[in-house]
Amino acid sequence: MIIETNHACDLVIFGAKGDLTKRKLLPALYKLEKSKKIHKYTRIIASGRADWSTEDYIEKIKTEVKNFLNEEINDLIWKNLSSRIFFCNIDVHEPLHFFRLKTILKQKKNIIVYYCAVPSNTLNSIFIGLGNAHLNSVPSRIVLEKPLGVCLKTSKKINDQISKYFLESQIFRIDHYLGKESILNLFALRFSNTCLFYNWNNKTIDHIQITVSEEVGIEDRWNYFNMMGQMKDMVQNHLLQILTILTMDQPKNISSESIQHEKVKILRSLNPINIHNINKKTVRGQYCSGVINEKKVPSYLEENGANKNSLTETFVAIKVDLNNKQWSGVPFYLRTGKRLAHKYSEIVVFFKKKPTNLFKNLNSELLQNKLIIRLEPNPNIIFDFSVKAPGLEQEYKIENSQLKSSQFSKKYSKNSIDAYERLLFEIMRGVQSLFVCRDEIEAAWKWIDPIIHAWKNSKNNAPQLYMSGTWGPKNSDLLLAHDGRVWYEFH
């Protein structure tokens, strides 16, 4: 059954020539057009400073869509999509230009969605321009990309600015990880399976590891990445989302308010990391040159436009503790980095060992049960457990076995939906459950800021170097070794 968006929308893209629009938004819109999920009267208004006609813009973006779509463009689908597109020449720093946009929008009675695919320092000009032109009334919606700001102070400033013109119910703050099928499955996995629901706590779980590993470097984004670093770009932005979904209490229902409420509670329960425990709780690194996929790659300081004295981290490993009844005493080890050995994202839940060993005659130590949740590539769920080794021996020889959800993996590869495809669909429907609220963002920054401050003010504040194509700095292993643990090996 085909479900299209409930109402016709005018999707206005600020930053229509930018990287996000070319790489993510337009390919996602093409796929939504292909699956007939866009209302037949929905329009796409691309805005930018270029003095282009609509025909100019459509001609230029077709090549870009081809590059990032990962499939051949179907002429009929492209014709249908491009017929929705209008180009509007706007300089967002010129408030009067927004009246040009108003002229186009007045032609229809569609619900207006403003997608801000622009840097954070441009946002307030957009808010002011829309407000002055009276283009901010309900039921219009506005979409902001995370991370919002670079710290708690700047994030609050942006939220204060937008709240002058838009209600919280109109604001959609995107973290694209929340549109990934494998991330959404964590809700179902946790809250629909009795065997996990009643064992998802500090009574049965020893510790949890979360890894988001990237093979790529900064991909010609020096100015942006050097300002953010891996902590702000990935931990604050994505890994904390995974952590909150893994640890939140069951919400009252699946409404955005209930889910966001439980996630905020987790973020506010994170034990602080500061100058007093920074070296025990965190490791940060920066990649050197090396070899990935048999290709030589440069160091971070050799990237295009690099500042040779930069101390920005490209790798973070961090031990996180929660101060609540359910998770007290269970450490969470997070790591993420660029130019690592393999690209993958994975959660590994280590269950506690049995206090007694019935089979100790032949097995000095029983193997630890593990639940491995592979997020990407090839999403899968694997359970590590112990069984009797086959044979005629009277004594029990215990060996490790794995239960793999092969059917789950096949379904995901066949029916996988791109994160932006899902999120754009939800935005046009007006559903906020996959988006982040103000309290959530500010609670995350409140925890992250002291870590950044401690790094800058510690005696040895330089990131540890690691060779591209490895698993990061050696101290990442020591972070777990101090607790008698090791990182789960990539398979």
From Swiss-Prot:
Statement: the UniProt record of this protein carries the keyword Transferase: no
Cellular compartments per GO CC: cytosol
Keyword NADP: yes
Reactions accelerated catalytically: D-glucose 6-phosphate + NADP(+) = 6-phospho-D-glucono-1,5-lactone + NADPH + H(+)
Active site, UniProt feature: H238
GO biological process: glucose metabolic process; pentose-phosphate shunt, oxidative branch
Keywords: Carbohydrate metabolism, Glucose metabolism, NADP, Oxidoreductase
Pathway terms, separated by semicolons: Carbohydrate degradation; pentose phosphate pathway; D-ribulose 5-phosphate from D-glucose 6-phosphate (oxidative stage): step 1/3
Matching HAMAP family: G6PD (MF_00966)
Known role: Catalyzes the oxidation of glucose 6-phosphate to 6-phosphogluconolactone.
NCBIfam families registered for this protein in UniProt: zwf
Descriptive protein name: Glucose-6-phosphate 1-dehydrogenase
Organism this protein belongs to: Buchnera aphidicola subsp. Acyrthosiphon pisum (strain APS) (Acyrthosiphon pisum symbiotic bacterium)
